[in-house]
From Swiss-Prot:
Pfam families: B3_4 (PF03483), B5 (PF03484), FDX-ACB (PF03147), tRNA_bind (PF01588), tRNA_synthFbeta (PF17759). Residues 39-147 form the tRNA-binding domain. Its cofactor is Mg(2+). GO terms for biological process: phenylalanyl-tRNA aminoacylation. It is found in: Cytoplasm. This is Phenylalanine--tRNA ligase beta subunit. CDD domains: PheRS_beta_core, tRNA_bind_bactPheRS. Tetramer of two alpha and two beta subunits. Residues 698-791 form the FDX-ACB domain. GO terms for cellular component: phenylalanine-tRNA ligase complex. It catalyses: tRNA(Phe) + L-phenylalanine + ATP = L-phenylalanyl-tRNA(Phe) + AMP + diphosphate + H(+). One of its GO terms (molecular function) is magnesium ion binding. The keyword Magnesium applies.
Length: 792
């Protein structure tokens, strides 16, 4: 946003110097990128009129001009500008004037005396236009100092706006922030209604719903087509980076820069029937002001009359309905469009306009009626004409409504770390145009309609911090006591789990929390899935229901790259759809491991062998031992597991996971040609541990008895050991499985389990009779409950 310093000061009277103003703007978040001083050294430059222009006798491109500079006699000036002509009013630098680094002196050019220099806008440092002399209006007072005539000195200030500050795309919007920061007040603005003189109107229809909820239009007839843009208006535009075009166009640009409301002027005689806002039809064509013919789709908003689109709403007017040097009747448009309806439409067509930039960020929905009155007043003042009544069409239900926000004193102090006096809070917020009502906790605040960025309490606090001054917030070091968190005695932390698995020679991996739906179908995991609304890609469209699919896929990629021994683990969240529709998905923390290849690293002391179920179960049992968890294993029916080499994992009777070999059919589908052994279980139940209780150490010796049973294949060791513990009771210190045998001497369908019973009493030495009685009971129970028999 570029603007004139003097224009800003006309809206907010402040005593700050130019440098102080620039520093203030940057301090309140309106970062100043450039300040260009204008007219600093034009003391001897005056308004002059060329009375006569003759061709230079020695140079085809030079003219010898007789110039009236208001000094009573004509001055002879040699000039090479292509637009030098009799009657032209232009700036004249007198002898002795300093223009930039050049001091003007009397000189001879190709043998002809020249007593000054007629100047272009670029030579004066007022504009980049160097094509010819700076043409001034014909009624400019000859002899008057140019600086006085143009309202100089001045400066062109350019600021960089953040996307949330669309309200500062206007001089008046910036003025509110400056007034608040400088403890001043914004000058009252006259936007009173202009009384209609005629009854001529143009009907307005709104057919775009919430995308265009407000549209104002006014007919002005009989304007003077020869009226020119006055120098004060043209200079304000020029210093704001806008090149003057024609009076009507310049007025709409002026209103946009001053108030922030983009406008458009149509030649009324080119419009047919009612005008309105509607969606474009696919394939519809429109000739734009820049001469391009564009083909529209149905995503564009258009301004249309009874038979055709006449403008791209919020972006650019149409070529066929533009105002020209012959326009006598005009229709002024001022509207509010929803930012989402304009956003991105210009880029589709390669357009970037000031109007589109403002509408994309958000324009004050209350501005259209004010802007059309201001524009009307300027048209009548500068070009005459007869105004009709304003036609105001709106859909109130779709207009943004400012919210009332509770601003608490305590919250201000908590967020900023400083206490701001109530009187300063009220002064700053009112200077920003906000309405305040005092309440017990602080204030109820309603932001002005131009402030789209004010939605919550913290937005108001941010404004207070900006205006109060970030440099006035004291620098303090963080305080407070540091508390050392004691490690939980009832739960193993995740770091300990990681360390335990690393100690077992597993390497941690981190995979995406999103997986491919096709991969889950291969694993036959299709229930309770959580799809993503906006996935990164089609292959990452589902939140993972478990860790194993991603972990095994990673293992497969490593195995395919000649890794002979792969041992991976992962800790992470898994996700499941909630039972109640509409509820948030359920999250839980899991731990998983997957291994393949050699059981041990290659060495001379151990024979090479492949990893098997019992190796991975050993890793799991070591992990469980860290928390004291007593795990049980039962045959699993999971479809992704090998039917004879997988088990469900239980703790305290609750299934918490799975361990086993990945089904060969699944491994083949995943292009993995080695056996993969894996486990996954819920982390929460695994890491819970019971506080150890100190018990009495027996002073009496323990006794060991070894027993071997022939049991059916389907009977698990877990079931047998549970029967032993229940039968023996407190005398049992430990039961150990030290042999499992299937083969010669054992009938088909049976297996031999050899166990060691370690018995001990705290009060006496066990006798042979005591031990024999226990053994007898154990044998009887196992034979009865498990159809087993003692092996001789």
């Amino acid at each position: 946003m570029k603007f004139s310093e003097n224009w800003l000061r006309s809206h907010v009277p402040i005593q700050a110097t130019r440098d102080e103003l620039a520093a203030t703007l940057t301090a309140i978040g309106l970062e100043v990128e450039e300040v260009i001083p204008l007219g600093e050294s034009l003391g001897q430059v005056v308004v002059a009129r060329i009375v006569e222009a003759m061709r230079h006798p020695e140079a085809d491109r030079l003219q010898v001009c007789s110039v009236d500079a208001g000094q009573g006699e004509l001055l002879q000036i040699v000039c090479g500008a292509p637009n030098a002509r009799p009657g032209l009013v232009a700036p004249l630098a007198l002898v002795g004037a300093k223009i930039g680094e050049l001091t003007i002196t009397a000189a001879k050019l190709r043998g002809v005396a020249s007593n000054g220099m007629l100047c272009s806008a670029k030579e004066l440092g007022l504009d980049s236009d160097a094509a010819g002399l700076f043409e001034l209006p014909d009624d400019a007072p000859v002899g008057q100092a140019l600086a006085e005539y143009l309202g100089l000195p001045d400066a062109s200030i350019e600021i960089k706006l953040t996307p949330n500050r669309a309200d500062c795309f206007s001089v008046r919007g910036i003025a509110f922030d400056v007034a608040a920061a400088c403890a001043s007040e914004v000058v009252a603005f006259d936007a009173g209604a202009v009384a209609p003189v005629s009854t001529r109107t143009l009907a307005v229809e709104l057919d775009a719903g919430k995308d265009a909820p407000r549209y104002c239009g006014r007919v002005i007839e009989g304007i003077d087509p020869a009226a020119k843009t006055p120098v004060w208006l043209a200079e304000r535009l020029r210093r704001s980076g806008v090149r003057p075009v024609s009076l009507l166009v310049d007025i709409t640009q002026y209103v946009m820069l001053e108030l922030g409301q983009p406008m458009h002027a149509f030649d009324l005689d080119t419009l047919h029937g009612p005008i309105g806002v509607r969606r474009s039809c696919a394939g519809e064509q429109l000739a734009l002001l820049d001469g391009r013919q564009v083909t529209l789709d149905d995503s564009f908003l258009t301004i249309a009359d009874a038979g055709r689109p006449v403008a791209l709403a919020g972006l650019m007017g149409g070529l066929d309905t533009r105002v020209t040097e012959t326009t006598r009747n005009v229709f002024l448009e001022s509207a509010y469009f929803d930012p989402a309806a304009i956003m991105g439409r210009g880029r589709k067509l390669g357009l970037h306009t000031d109007a589109g930039h403002r509408f994309e960020r958000g324009v004050d929905p209350a501005l259209p009626p004010q802007a059309i009155e201001v524009a009307t007043r300027l048209v009548l003042e500068l070009a005459g004409g007869t105004p009709g009544p304003v036609v105001h069409a709106q859909l109130p239900q779709h207009l943004p409504q400012p919210a009332r926000i509770l601003l608490r004193r305590a919250r201000i102090a908590r967020v900023l770390g400083i206490q701001i006096d109530d009187v300063d809070v009220v002064r700053m917020l009112r200077a920003l145009g906000m309405q305040l009502d005092a309440v017990a906790e602080g204030w109820e605040v309603m932001a002005p309609s131009r402030r789209f960025d004010i939605a919550i309490e913290e937005d108001l606090i941010e404004d207070l911090a900006r205006i109060h001054g970030y440099d006035r917030v004291p620098t303090t070091l963080p305080g407070g006591a540091s508390r050392i968190a004691m490690p939980s005695e009832t739960q193993l932390d995740e770091l300990s789990v990681r360390r335990q698995l690393v100690a077992r020679e597993l390497q941690e991996t981190i995979n995406y929390a999103f997986v491919d739906a096709a991969l889950l179908e291969r694993w036959q995991l299709t229930n309770g899935l959580v799809p993503l609304a906006n996935p990164l890609s089609a292959e990452l469209a589902i939140m993972r229901p478990c860790l194993l699919p991603g972990l095994v896929a990673t293992l497969g990629r490593n195995a395919a790259r000649q890794a002979g021994r792969v041992r991976l683990f992962e800790l992470g969240k898994v996700f499941a759809a909630a039972a109640d529709a509409g509820a948030a998905p359920q999250e839980s923390q899991h731990v998983a491991a997957a291994v393949c290849g050699d059981a041990l690293a290659l060495q001379w002391g151990e024979a090479a062998r492949k990893v098997d179920f019992h190796d991975v179960k050993g890793d799991l049992m070591a992990l469980a031992a860290a928390s004291g968890a007593q795990l049980e294993f039962q045959p699993s029916t999971q479809p992704f597991g090998h039917p004879g080499r997988s088990a469900d994992i239980y703790r305290d009777g609750v299934c918490i996971g799975w361990i086993g070999q990945v089904h060969p059919r699944l491994a083949k589908a995943l292009d993995i040609d080695v056996d993969v052994i894996a486990f996954e279980l819920q982390l929460g139940p695994l890491v819970q541990r019971t506080l150890p209780c100190a018990g009495e150490l027996s002073r009496f010796p323990s006794v060991r008895r070894d027993l071997a049973f022939l049991v059916p294949d389907e009977v698990s060791w877990a079931a047998v050991s549970a029967s032993v513990r229940t039968t023996v009771g407190p005398l049992l210190r430990e039961v150990q499985l030290f042999d499992r045998y299937v083969g010669q001497g054992v009938a088909p369908g049976f297996k031999s389990l050899a166990m060691g019973l370690i018995l001990q009493d705290n009060s006496r030495t066990l006798t042979d009779r005591d031990v024999d009685a226990v053994v007898t009971d154990v044998v009887a129970v196992i034979e009865r409950e498990h159809r087993a028999r003692i092996r001789s």
